[in-house]
């Protein structure tokens, strides 16, 4: 301590007791200064020695107490009591009658109201202080170094004294246990074994780590904390030699693995893509590359699946996936734009590894992921037809796999746009479906084969993919290669040039049945693989058919069918062969479990009538094919095998069609029964009488109502129209009880039948006017019906 530290109003006062014999302070040479309460303050020598001359009379204890009180009021009153030479080896004692403890910046200080003397240490206990006039005061010195404890003395009431413990050195140890949050939510503790703490002269604490651990500390002035990004665990990433490219000047790379990843991003492995890993609302974007012949590289990323997003990093044939999701670069982006940077770079040298912990300063904010890309020869892509031998030769090329996700209203499309840079950096951002309907890709010059896979969802949720591979691309200008994908379910690849490949949707799978392609009259000649029907050839049979305005033709030619189908659609979209329109007659009852995307071949009927080959072996074209129920005691006859199978489900009690209306849950054996039941919930009456404004929910009710009009007019009439049944169609269903057509005219292309009055009602409901005649004649069907 210096004198300036104790230049205050009240300083520490130490009274040096004097003795004559010289043996009164022999025991005061301990490690610390002994603090005790003084018993004598006379001007002469101590009365305990008994040997000196010139002694004054010893005051009484009451006088001593009065003198002590007077020293508190007047500090210079008893300055003459410290006269006389002090003996060498005398013990320094502190008068703690009115002592106060004060905590300063450098420790505890003992403050007394007396200023006659100062505290002395044990090294200066033999030196005398000449205080004849009482005005001198020695320098303030610190007590010898040691740990101080607070000890309570019995003589001092409610006061505490700092007592120095001799022989104890200050040694402070700290144990630093950092806690990190792992990906699965558990706490991970790293114990710093054998860590020692040292304090240098500048007051900074240095932590010496144990074996195999590194703890970053701050040696500068001030206790700054390392500003790390939230929810990030910084790790060192081993890097290997990459392909045949040349790295830039940087030699240190860092990866930041996020614990929580915002946004709906799913990385799919290209070798195990199945329908289970794809959902209609998922956004898939995967880029894999195969370049050098190095193998055995491991994925360097790992993530955890959370409720709002999932990050799946997998390895396809020892090839790694690398993304940078939702990181904020130097450019200004909005909240709904997730920038994804894909970087591929490498060197032609041997596989060298380096571990750094350098922090990337350009990244700010959470949910960032920067990972460099290793290129291996084992990265095979699904749908790729390239052999392994070709992959080993094309070391400088890349395979780009683009999987456009199935989007719904309000969701975003992922647009990949490649900039012509040396490192082949791909940047993508989320664009709304309303602003961008297509997916455009600009390939880089000398790039590898590009594989485009378009998803298609069937009626039962099964996902099928269409693969398009483009090879040997030589891009001269940045806008030469443009690939446009339309986000439609029913997609067909058209014949276009090599520079522009366009996928054009032909029809939507929701509006047409499976296996049926709806085209206009102008598209019949341009579409390959479709059979066209020359309606003028039907003039030999005395029938003339004209296409109605605004009514396209629906042509279905499926392998296994016995005849082509020709249908006329009305303006309201309610076709003649629609399942909901004519389902009650049982003409279009589909199988209980239809296959998605394809139609199965018709199964051979096992009824007794077909087994005897009497029905199918008959050469009579006017005879209908019949199918008889083999259940004993039933014997019902049907014209279609699907009707017979639906009837057999009625026998077995199987009801695969269930109503999904709230609190209903009824099940039915046929789909037309389910459609008819749903109209009871909605109250829809789609069958209208052509002669009166009455409407009905069921077609059989309408047919009964039409009979009332026919009875008033004097008999039923017969009309001729174009039916939608194939050549093997026959009678109605079991429940309708309608009569079979009275006449059937068969041609090689279509089936013309004379229908019953309820068929007339169906045609009238669909917007087609049919003229009724009493006998079979040539009829011109036009827009106005006449």
UniProtKB/Swiss-Prot annotation:
Residues 709-786 are annotated as: Domain D. Expressed in all tissues tested, including lung, kidney, spleen and thymus. The modification N-acetylserine is found at residue 2. There is a cross-link at residue 15 (Glycyl lysine isopeptide (Lys-Gly) (interchain with G-Cter in SUMO)). Phosphorylated on multiple serine and threonine residues. Phosphorylation is coupled to ubiquitination, sumoylation and proteolytic processing. Phosphorylation on Ser-60 enhances proteolytic cleavage. Phosphorylation on Ser-7 enhances ubiquitination and protein degradation. Hyperphosphorylation on Ser-102 in response to DNA damage has no effect on transcriptional activity. MAPK1/MAPK3-mediated phosphorylation on Thr-454 and Thr-740 enhances VEGF transcription but, represses FGF2-triggered PDGFR-alpha transcription. Also implicated in the repression of RECK by ERBB2. The record marks 64-65 as: Cleavage. Disulfide bonds: none annotated. Residues 2-83 are annotated as: Repressor domain. Signal peptide: none annotated. Residues 36-48, 73-86, 125-137, 343-358, 372-397 have a biased composition (Low complexity). SMART domains: ZnF_C2H2. Residues 262-496 are annotated as: Transactivation domain B (Gln-rich). InterPro entries: Znf_C2H2_sf (IPR036236), Znf_C2H2_type (IPR013087). Transcription factor that can activate or repress transcription in response to physiological and pathological stimuli. Binds with high affinity to GC-rich motifs and regulates the expression of a large number of genes involved in a variety of processes such as cell growth, apoptosis, differentiation and immune responses. Highly regulated by post-translational modifications (phosphorylations, sumoylation, proteolytic cleavage, glycosylation and acetylation). Also binds the PDGFR-alpha G-box promoter. May have a role in modulating the cellular response to DNA damage. This is Transcription factor Sp1. It comes from Rattus norvegicus (Rat).
């Amino acid at each position: 301590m210096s004198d300036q530290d104790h230049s205050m109003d009240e300083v520490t006062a130490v009274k040096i007791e004097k003795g004559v014999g010289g043996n009164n302070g022999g025991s005061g040479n301990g490690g610390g200064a002994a603090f005790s309460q003084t018993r004598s303050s006379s001007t002469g020598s101590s009365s305990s020695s008994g040997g000196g001359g010139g002694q004054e009379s010893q005051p009484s204890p009451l006088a001593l107490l009065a003198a002590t009180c007077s020293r508190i009021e007047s500090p210079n009153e008893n300055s003459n009591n410290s006269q006389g030479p002090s003996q060498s080896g005398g013990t320094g004692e502190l008068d703690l009658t009115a002592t106060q403890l004060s905590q300063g910046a450098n420790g505890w200080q003992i403050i007394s109201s007396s200023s006659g003397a100062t505290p002395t240490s044990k090294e200066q206990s033999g030196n005398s202080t000449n205080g004849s006039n009482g005005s001198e005061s020695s320098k303030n010195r610190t007590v010898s170094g040691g740990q101080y404890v607070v000890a309570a003395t019995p003589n001092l009431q409610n006061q505490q004294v700092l007592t120095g413990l001799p022989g104890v050195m200050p040694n402070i140890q700290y144990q630093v246990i950092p806690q990190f949050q792992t990906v699965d939510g558990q706490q991970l503790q790293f114990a710093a074994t054998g860590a020692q703490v040292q304090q240098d002269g500048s007051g900074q604490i240095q932590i010496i780590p144990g074996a195999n651990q590194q703890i970053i500390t701050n040696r500068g002035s001030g206790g700054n904390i390392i500003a790390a990004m939230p929810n990030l665990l910084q790790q060192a990433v081993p890097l290997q030699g990459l392909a045949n490219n040349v790295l830039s000047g940087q030699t240190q790379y860092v990866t930041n693995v996020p614990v929580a990843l915002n946004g709906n991003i799913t990385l799919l492995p290209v070798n195990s893509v199945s329908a289970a890993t794809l959902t209609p609302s998922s956004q898939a974007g995967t880029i894999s590359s195969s370049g050098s012949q190095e193998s055995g590289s491991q994925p360097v990323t790992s993530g955890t699946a959370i409720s709002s997003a999932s990050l799946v990093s997998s390895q396809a044939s020892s090839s790694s996936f690398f993304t940078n999701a939702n990181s904020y670069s130097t450019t200004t982006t909005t909240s709904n734009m997730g920038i994804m940077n894909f970087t591929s770079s490498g060197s032609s040298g041997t596989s060298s590894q380096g571990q750094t912990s350098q922090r990337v300063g350009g990244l700010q904010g959470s949910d960032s992921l920067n990972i460099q890309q290793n290129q291996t020869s084992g990265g095979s892509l699904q749908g790729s037809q390239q052999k392994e031998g070709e992959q080993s030769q094309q070391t400088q090329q890349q395979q780009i796999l683009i999987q456009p996700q199935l989007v719904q209203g309000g969701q975003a499309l992922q647009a990949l746009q490649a900039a012509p840079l040396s490192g082949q950096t791909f940047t993508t951002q989320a664009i709304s479906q309303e602003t961008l309907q297509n997916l455009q890709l600009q390939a880089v010059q000398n790039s590898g084969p590009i594989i485009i896979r378009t998803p298609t969802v069937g009626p039962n949720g099964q996902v099928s993919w269409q693969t398009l591979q483009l090879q040997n691309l030589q891009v001269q200008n940045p806008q030469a290669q443009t690939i446009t994908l339309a986000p439609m379910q029913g997609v067909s690849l058209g014949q276009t040039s090599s520079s522009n490949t366009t996928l054009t949707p032909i029809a939507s799978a929701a509006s047409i049945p499976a296996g049926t392609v709806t085209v206009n009259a102008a598209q019949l000649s341009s579409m390959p693989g479709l059979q066209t029907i020359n309606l003028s050839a039907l003039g030999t049979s005395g029938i003339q058919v004209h296409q109605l305005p605004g009514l396209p033709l629906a042509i279905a030619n499926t392998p296994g069918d016995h005849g082509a189908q020709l249908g006329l659609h009305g303006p309201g979209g309610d076709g003649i062969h629609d399942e909901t329109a004519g389902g009650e007659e049982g003409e279009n009852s589909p199988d209980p479990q239809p296959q998605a995307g394809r139609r199965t071949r018709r199964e051979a009927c096992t009824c007794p009538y077909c087994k005897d080959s009497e029905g199918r072996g008959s050469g009579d074209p006017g005879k209908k094919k019949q199918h008889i129920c083999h259940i004993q005691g039933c014997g019902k006859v049907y014209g279609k095998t699907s009707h017979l199978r639906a009837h057999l489900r009625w026998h077995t009690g199987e009801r695969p069609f269930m109503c999904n209306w709230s609190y209903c849950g009824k099940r039915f054996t046929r789909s037309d029964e389910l459609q008819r039941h749903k109209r009871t919930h909605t109250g829809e009456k789609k069958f209208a009488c052509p002669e009166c404004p009455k409407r009905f929910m069921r077609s059989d009710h309408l047919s009964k109502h039409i009979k009332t009009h026919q009875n008033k007019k004097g008999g039923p009439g017969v009309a001729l129209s174009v039916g939608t049944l194939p050549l093997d169609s026959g009678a109605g269903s079991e429940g309708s009880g309608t009569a079979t057509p009275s006449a059937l005219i068969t041609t090689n292309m279509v089936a013309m039948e004379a229908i019953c009055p309820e068929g007339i009602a169906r045609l009238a409901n669909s917007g087609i006017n049919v003229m009724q005649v009493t006998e079979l004649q040539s009829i011109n069907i036009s827009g106005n019906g006449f």
